[in-house]
Amino acid sequence: MTARTYQQKRAALHDAQDYCVDIHNRTIFLHAHITESEDDPGVDYRMSSRLIKNLHLLKNLNEKDPITIHLQSIGGIWHEGMAIYDAIKLSSAHIKIIGHGSISSMGTVIMQAADERVIMPHAEFMVHYGEFSFIW
């Protein structure tokens, strides 16, 4: 393996792990950012801003080619989830979402934004009545 090939593979691995995007394969990994001190926080600002940036990145590289999103989410904050939903719906590219593991609450709403949905054999969904609050 040449030094350049090694560096390219290392950069691709870094992007997939740190930024949750595989540019070469037009794939986004949509899951919560987990640290050692917390459980899965679900859909939050970090998750939504990362997804929106990655969608724009892939769209700017090529508007026509499809994008695949791998989703695993226990749910989360309504407004952040709707930001993800809107960003996916706004995309001119064909979006396929593949659901893994637990797709719960807001995760099920995000799944509906896709042009194509694939559910892995051992994935499970959880849907519940919504709650609302007023912002003054």
Regions found by a protein language model. Name each.
Residues 1-136:
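Terminal-region recognition feature
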